[in-house]
Structure formats: structure tokens, C-alpha cells
Amino acid sequence: MRLEDLQEELKKDVFIDSTKLQYEAANNVMLYSKWLNKHSSIKKEMLRIEAQKKVALKARLDYYSGRGDGDEFSMDRYEKSEMKTVLSADKDVLKVDTSLQYWGILLDFCSGALDAIKSRGFAIKHIQDMRAFEAGK
């Protein structure tokens, strides 16, 4: 899932065809459901990546503290105060952390998309009300 793809998809979904207001109003529920599914899928993926991050942190902590399994351990010794910096800069942990941050951006975007779909429903209602007013009803 890419942010650019989600942006393009939202751009198409928020468009209101003023010649089909009844259809657009009915379709709004389906659009909200679609984006809610995307939101929950992204949240689920973030939980999986958070678990991966914990495993990676534990493995790298064991590596740097010399408690690693077998022959894999760091010859460098770090103080406890240095360990936090060393772990956060480790390439394995950094890769997982970057992935988690990217999925966080996707989650924020989907949350905004849900708000946009809600606003779309209100906009459709206002257009219908304005047309009724203009027709003298």
C-alpha cells in the first residue's frame, strides 16, 4: 500500500457528481465503509510491525550486551546509558522503526479520509437542500 495510491483513490472518492445526487448520497455509506476497512487493515499491520520491532530490539540488545545465542555477539561493550542510542541507530531496528512510521502516516491519512467522506455526506445534503430552496420548496 502506497501513500500516493491512497491519495489518488481519495481524490476520486470525494468527487461529487451533481447530476447524480441520489446515487452519491447512497454511495457515501459504501465509501465510508471502504475507507474504514483500509483504516483497520493499516492498524492491524501496525500492530504486526510493532511486534516485529520488539523482537528486533530484543535480538539486538542480546547481540550488543553479549547475551546472544551462539557465536553472534558484539565485541564492543556499551554502557547502559549508551545502549539506547546504539539500539535506535541499529540498521535492523531502524528499518522496522521506519516502516512503522510510514504505516503511521498511512493511518493518519486514512483517518483524514474518513473525515472527508463524512464531510462529503454533509456537502451532498447541503446541495440537495439548496436545490429544494431554489425550486421553491
Curated annotation (Swiss-Prot):
Q: How does it assemble?
A: Homohexamer. Interacts with gp32.
State what protein this is by name: Recombination protein uvsY
> Does the record carry Zinc as a key word?
no
Q: InterPro entries in the record, alphabetically? A: UvsY
* Pfam families on file: UvsY
What does this protein do, in the record's words? Answer: Plays a role in viral DNA synthesis by promoting enzymatic activities of UvsX recombinase, by promoting UvsX-ssDNA filament assembly, and by helping UvsX to displace bound gp32 from ssDNA.
Please cite one Gene Ontology biological process associated with this protein: DNA biosynthetic process
- For this UniProt record, give its keywords in alphabetical order, as a comma-separated list: DNA recombination, DNA synthesis, DNA-binding
Q: Which GO terms describe its molecular function?
A: DNA binding
Top-level taxon: Viruses
Name of encoding gene? uvsY
